[in-house]
Amino acid sequence: MPELPEVEVTRLSFAERIAGARIEAVLVGKPLRWPLGCETQQLQGQRVLAVRRRGKYLLLDLSEGLLLMHLGMSGSVSFGLNLPVTGKHDHFDMVTSLGTLRLHDPRRFGAVVYASGEDDAVAKKLLGRLGVEPLSDAFDALVFHQWLKGRKTAIKPLLLAGQAVVGVGNIYASEALFLAGIRPTTKASLISKPRAARLHRAIQDVLTNAVAKGGSTLRDFSNADGEAGHFQLDAMVYDRAGLPCRVCAAPIKSIRQGQRSSFYCATCQKP
C-alpha cells in the first residue's frame, strides 16, 4: 500500500508540471472505492491551481473546489503528454492542457472524489480524523509523549492507526522503531519521555529519508514518471526475518501484530 512517502513522492513528481493546467476532459472507467461526486462536465474548464498532500491523500486545488485522490492498496499516478492507450486497470483520466493525469489501480481500492472545499462534508469525512503531519511543525515531541501515555496498546499498531500521527505505514513504523530502539510490542504507555523523543525524531528521519529515496517499491509502486522507489533496499529490519541485524548481527525476528508482520532486532530494540 502506498504510504505517506510514496504519496509525497508522487506529488513532487507532477505538482509543478500540472500547476496552471486547464482541464479539458475527465474520463472515468470502472467504479472505484467511492464515486467521483460530481458530473465530469463540472470539472471541464477548471484550472489546477496546486497539488498538496494530507496524510495519504493528494489534494488537487481547482479554480472551484478540489479533487481528493487516494491511491488505495495498489494505485499509482501517471502524468504526461503521451501516455499509452488506456489499459484494463486505468480507471481515471483527467486530460489537461499540459498533459493527462491518470490513476492506475488494479485492486480498485483507490478513489478520486470532488469536494467544493475542505469544509465540505465529503472532505471533512475523509480528512477530519487524520492525525498530525509527521513532517510538519505540528508534530510536537512533548504532545506525542503525552498522547502515548494514555494508551496501553502496543506501539506498532498504534502508529499504523494514524490517530496521533498520520502516514506511518508498516515498513516505516518498523524502521522508526528500530532506529529508536523500541520493540514493536512495547506498550505505548510505558514509553518514557526520552524514548518518545527518540521515536519522534526517528519517525521524521525515516520518512524524510524515504521521500529522498523515492519511496518504497515493494510490489508495483512508481511515481508519476514511472520511476520506482529504493528505500526498501536499505531497510534495517523490514522484510529481513532471519537475516543478521546490520548493527549487531543478531537474527532479525518477525511476529504478527493484528494482520501485519512486524520486524525487529531483539538485541537493539528493548521492551
Swiss-Prot record:
Catalytic activity: Hydrolysis of DNA containing ring-opened 7-methylguanine residues, releasing 2,6-diamino-4-hydroxy-5-(N-methyl)formamidopyrimidine; 2'-deoxyribonucleotide-(2'-deoxyribose 5'-phosphate)-2'-deoxyribonucleotide-DNA = a 3'-end 2'-deoxyribonucleotide-(2,3-dehydro-2,3-deoxyribose 5'-phosphate)-DNA + a 5'-end 5'-phospho-2'-deoxyribonucleoside-DNA + H(+)
UniProt-annotated binding residues for DNA: H89, R107, R151
Gene3D superfamilies: 1.10.8.50, MutM-like, N-terminal
Keywords assigned by UniProt, alphabetized: DNA damage, DNA repair, DNA-binding, Glycosidase, Hydrolase, Lyase, Metal-binding, Multifunctional enzyme, Zinc, Zinc-finger
GO MF terms, alphabetically ordered: 8-oxo-7,8-dihydroguanine DNA N-glycosylase activity; class I DNA-(apurinic or apyrimidinic site) endonuclease activity; damaged DNA binding; zinc ion binding
Transmembrane residue ranges: none
InterPro entries: DNA_glyclase/AP_lyase_DNA-bd, DNA_glyclase_Znf_dom_DNA_BS, Formamido-pyr_DNA_Glyclase, FPG_cat, MutM-like_N-ter, Ribosomal_uS13-like_H2TH, Znf_DNA_glyclase/AP_lyase, Znf_FPG/IleRS
Gene Ontology biological process terms, A to Z: base-excision repair
Cofactor stoichiometry and binding remark: Binds 1 zinc ion per subunit.
The organism's place on the tree of life at top rank: Bacteria
Keyword set includes Iron: no
A Pfam family per the record: Fapy_DNA_glyco
Active site per the UniProt annotation: P2, E3, K56, R260
Cofactor (UniProt): Zn(2+)
Zinc finger (FPG-type) stretch: 236-270
PROSITE patterns, A to Z: FPG_CAT, ZF_FPG_1, ZF_FPG_2
EC code: 3.2.2.23, 4.2.99.18
PANTHER family tied to this protein: FORMAMIDOPYRIMIDINE-DNA GLYCOSYLASE
Recorded family membership: Belongs to the FPG family.
Function, as annotated: Involved in base excision repair of DNA damaged by oxidation or by mutagenic agents. Acts as a DNA glycosylase that recognizes and removes damaged bases. Has a preference for oxidized purines, such as 7,8-dihydro-8-oxoguanine (8-oxoG). Has AP (apurinic/apyrimidinic) lyase activity and introduces nicks in the DNA strand. Cleaves the DNA backbone by beta-delta elimination to generate a single-strand break at the site of the removed base with both 3'- and 5'-phosphates.
Subunit structure of this chain's protein: Monomer.
Protein name stated in the entry: Formamidopyrimidine-DNA glycosylase
Organism of origin: Polaromonas naphthalenivorans (strain CJ2)
Phylogenetic lineage: Bacteria, Pseudomonadati, Pseudomonadota, Betaproteobacteria, Burkholderiales
